[in-house]
Amino acid sequence: MTRKRKTALAAGLLAAMLLGGCSGGDGVDIAQGVAYLEALEQQDPDAVDQILRQRRLEQLEREREELLRQVKAGEQDPFPLFQDAVILGDSRAVGFFYYGFVDESRDLTGSGETILDIPKKLDTLQAMNPRYVYLAYGLNDIKIGHWGSLQAHISEYLDRVQDIRERLPEAVIVISSVLPYHDPNARTDATGETPPTSGSSLTEADRKRLAQIPEWNRLMADAAREHGVIFVDNSAICQEYENLWEKDGIHVSKSFYPHWGKNLIVAALEEGGIADESASA
């Protein structure tokens, strides 16, 4: 290792030590760092890089924890954290781009889409090479009943996740739970009357299938855990912000997306993502 390289590493080590709260006082300086590295290098040439890597990992973990705290506390807008992510999903997910929360370059959603649309997006997704992939499918899948059972649909969903993993082995994949359907016919206003709706085209069979959404979410949560995939449970925000559903009982208003986006980002942060960049960089 050249002396120039040792000086740079010593400066990095010193910075890491100070960031880590390990200040050595006035006696810690670059010259001492170089001497320390030279002595350490004679014992183990790889030890220097190992120390710096460990310090970097510790620093990233502190940054991740602080970012998580800020997002949860509402001090950090979650949407800038989507800059290295891509969202795929149905018309509900389209709202992230439509309402201006996520840039069009990060959006691969489409109205009426299901997991059957994922294969045709793989080449584009691979070319985009995102660090994070958020999947928000399920409403249309459950409604059409194509798979015959929830378990069969979940199995194919996870097959499509595996397809993405094969194209993007380093990407973090996050599955959003399916937002519930609120039957407009079951709602009443302050007078006890059913308010007028925007004219949903759902059949009674559609409504019965959509009533399975909570069960689908439960089954997918278990399956995702078994397959090492992050699953985001949106049930709490869906209950808290039920008033943000549109009259059709399917779509959500613009005001709901910050809560949904926050949920997605928090899930990735809690699993060690977002701030956890490569320590070897």
Spans of features found by a protein language model:
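Active-site segments of SGNH/GDSL-like serine hydrolases
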Residues: 136, 140, 165-210
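Extracytoplasmic/secreted proteins, especially bacterial periplasmic and envelope-associated proteins
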Residues: 83, 87, 120, 132, ...
